[in-house]
Each structure stands twice: as C-alpha cells, then as structure tokens.
From Swiss-Prot:
Catalytic reactions on record: [protein]-peptidylproline (omega=180) = [protein]-peptidylproline (omega=0)
Name assigned to this protein: Peptidyl-prolyl cis-trans isomerase E
SUPFAM superfamilies registered for this protein in UniProt: Cyclophilin-like (SSF50891), RNA-binding domain, RBD (SSF54928)
Keywords: Isomerase, mRNA processing, mRNA splicing, Nucleus, Phosphoprotein, RNA-binding, Rotamase, Spliceosome
One GO MF term attached to the UniProt entry: poly(A) binding
InterPro entries: Cyclophilin-like_dom_sf (IPR029000), Cyclophilin-type_PPIase_CS (IPR020892), Cyclophilin-type_PPIase_dom (IPR002130), Nucleotide-bd_a/b_plait_sf (IPR012677), PPIE (IPR016304), PPIE_RRM (IPR034168), RBD_domain_sf (IPR035979), RRM_dom (IPR000504)
Quaternary context: Identified in the spliceosome C complex. Component of the XAB2 complex, a multimeric protein complex composed of XAB2, PRPF19, AQR, ZNF830, ISY1, and PPIE. Identified in a pentameric intron-binding (IB) complex composed of AQR, XAB2, ISY1, ZNF830 and PPIE that is incorporated into the spliceosome as a preassembled complex. The IB complex does not contain PRPF19. Interacts (via RNA-binding domain) with KMT2A (via the third PHD-type zinc-finger).
Outcome recorded upon mutating residue 51 to A: Impairs protein folding
Gene Ontology CC annotation, any one: ficolin-1-rich granule lumen
Enzyme Commission no: 5.2.1.8
The organism of origin for this protein: Homo sapiens (Human)
Family note: Belongs to the cyclophilin-type PPIase family. PPIase E subfamily.
C-alpha cells in the first residue's frame, strides 16, 4: 500500500494542539504509526499543520471523511491526503519540505463558519434549571448492566433524545430491548481510549467491523443538533457520512472535533462512575485491558 495513501496533512491547527491531542482525535479511525508537527525554530512553536500516518489506507480515508472541516480547539481544520511528490520512500527529509501544496495550505483555516458564530445550536445537556424528569416523560430511558472481567461493575442509565433525533434514538432503544430479535446484550466495549471515549455496539463481529441497525445495514445521519460538549454523551460511531448501524460510543470528555461528524442522541443520567470504570480499562491504542461486557440491557417503562 502506497505510503501517500496513509499519510494525512492536517492544517489549521491552534497553538494548543500537540501530538497527544492529535493522537486522541485520530486514533478512533485506526492504528497510527507516526505523528509529525513541524516546528518554526524562530518562534519555537509549531507551524499550524501536522502529518498523521496510519497503518492502513482505509483508516486514513475514514479519518478524512470524519475530520475534514471539523473543529479542534475552536479552529476549523483541513484534513487531506499529503502529497509529497518528490520525496522517495525511506527518505529522511520531512515531507513538507518540497511540497508546494502543503506550503499553500499550511496554517490555513476555513472562514465559512465565522458567519455562523453567535447562532450556536442547542447542546446535549439540559437547559439550566430544567429538571431531567421533564424530558424523561417524553424521551425514553434505557440501561446497561456492565461486567468488567468476571465482576459486575454497575449500571449505566441513559436518556435518549427522541425529541431531537427520533430515528437514531429508536434504533438504540430497540437494540437495548432486543424487541427486533437482536441487540446489545452480551456484546462488548471493544475500543476504549481514556480521556476520549468508550465504543461498543458491534454484536456481530465484536471488533468494530460489524453490527446492524433495526432499519437494515446502515442509515443516514439524522442531524447534528446535539454536540459533544462533555463526558457521558451518547453518540453514533460510523465509518463516514451516513453509515450508522449499531455501534455507539460514550464520551469521557469534551470531544468537540466530532461535532458535525457523529450524531449525538443521548446522555448518561446515572452511572457516570461506571463509565469511569470502563474508561480505566482502556489504553492509548484502544485495546481494553479486560473484557468489558454489556451483561444486560433494557428500557425503563
């Protein structure tokens, strides 16, 4: 597989972004082999762009689909394939040294979103002063009983925002109740990255490559009204636009670079401590230290 299909150019980076931030942002899409952030040695700061190399070309393509024109530390970033035309494989020269395309785009951010500032859409958390019980009357609540290793860890209770994303919420609700004949019970959280997210929902292949929705194999992104504003938010995992199935993730922290790319459809109302126990089983590459199983799940009626 050509290296150029695996190396991404990431431009428009804020000063706060470092290799750890980039690793956390891009690791959900696959194994990363290298991250380079060129420095300006006069200012001792990075130059506003970076290169992320994936092990597999298809993972790099998924990262482009999800991360291009997303927001990271308040800046809209560009994510494209790096195109080092004159550098041979194995060369020790940095890939940005001869690439006019990179010089053109380094440090550039998109301006389109500036006009939209000030009209921020509703966020996933409830409005200040509004009791959670008010939404519970119209929105379903579901639960998952978690087992870590061979020991019960507790229950996570979640409110599904059917008032905002009814199709996505109904898919998740039915997968919790198994009323369609299949669902989450007995499946695992196969990808866990501390300070980022815990991903599960692949009840067919159990490795992030499978799962299915109640509507068939995949369904479209419903909307992106709700945002990834903090820990305990429930969002759809995908492999690009309009590829929702059954896989989902629970955020461990604010992950605003996923806004507009993944559909947020719920939030943890009880059991955030259980989510933290799941998070503690994670690793930088996402492989859990112990098996984390959804031992039981269902709906509060």
């Amino acid at each position: 597989m050509a290296t150029t299909k695996r190396v991404l150019y990431v431009g428009g980076l804020a000063e706060e972004v470092d290799d750890k931030v980039l690793h956390a942002a891009f690791i959900p899409f696959g194994d990363i082999t290298d991250i380079q952030i060129p420095l300006d040695y006069e200012t001792e700061k990075h130059r506003g762009f970076a290169f992320v190399e994936f092990e597999l070309a298809e993972d790099a393509a998924a990262a482009i689909d999800n991360m291009n024109e997303s927001e990271l530390f308040g800046r809209t970033i560009r994510v494209n394939l790096a195109k080092p035309m004159r550098i041979k494989e194995g060369s020790s020269r940095p890939v940005w040294s001869d690439d006019d395309w990179l010089k053109k785009f380094s440090g550039k951010t998109l301006e389109e979103n500036k006009e939209e500032e000030g009209s921020e859409p509703p966020k996933a958390e409830t409005q200040e002063g509004e009791p959670i019980a008010k939404k519970a009357r119209s929105n379903p609540q579901v639960y998952m009983d978690i087992k870590i290793g061979n020991k019960p860890a507790g229950r996570i209770q979640m409110l599904l925002r059917s008032d905002v994303v009814p199709m996505t919420a109904e898919n998740f609700r039915c997968l919790c109740t198994h009323e369609k004949g299949f669902g989450f019970k007995g499946s695992s959280f196969h990808r866990i990255i501390p300070q980022f997210m815990c991903q599960g929902g692949d009840f067919t292949n159990h490795n992030g490559t499978g799962g299915k929705s109640i509507y068939g194999k995949k369904f479209d992104d419903e909307n992106f009204i709700l945002k990834h504003t903090g820990p305990g938010l429930l969002s759809m995992a995908n492999s690009g636009p309009n590829t929702n199935g059954s896989q989902f993730f629970l955020t461990c922290d604010k992950t605003d670079w996923l806004d507009g790319k993944h559909v947020v459809f719920g939030e943890v109302t009880e059991g955030l401590d259980v989510l933290r126990q799941i998070e503690a089983q994670g690793s930088k590459d996402g492989k859990p230290k112990q098996k984390v199983i959804i031992a039981d799940c269902g709906e509060y009626v």
